[in-house]
Amino acid sequence: ADFLFELGTEELPSSAVEKLGNLLLENLCEEFKKLNLNFNKTEAFATPRRLGAKINELDCITPQSIKINWGPSTSIAFDSSGNLTKAGEAFANKFKLDRNALNQFIKQDGSQEKLCYEEISMGVGVETLFQQIILSAITKLPISKKMRWSTNRDYFLRPVRWAVLMFGEQTHKIELFSFTTGNKTRGHR
């Protein structure tokens, strides 16, 4: 689905507008790539009162991932009688494994046999990650002189007045600079 984010502000310095618009898009793309999300065409837009990014055909769900957790070698995890040692028990406790079934979790790691547990993480809907992705992308913008306005504790180059966040046909609401994102943008004053 298509992703659209727009940040509406008071007048931005003309020297920073285009650079910030492009960097916002780059930062968002970088965050999506970290999550192994695919997308197609991207577009940055910036005017003195808004910074925005549009990303076409963004994946809706993060891919499933498998994390391999290696434990101690079998010579350390089991004593000479085949009973669990403290290292083997710690591995079983860490991953909540049945101590009697640890033989299922033995794999060859190059030169030796070790305990090994594979964690499968199911993909999550990308909408649940928008808050952290957007905050990270904004935080990485190189802003030397930040302003604080009103009573909130947020800082940005100029006071933020609105934010738009859409994914596909849906409006997504996240908290950003004491605003809730919506689907309404503003034109000239």
Regions found by a protein language model. Name each.
Residues 1-189:
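Long, basic N-terminal domains or extensions that often function
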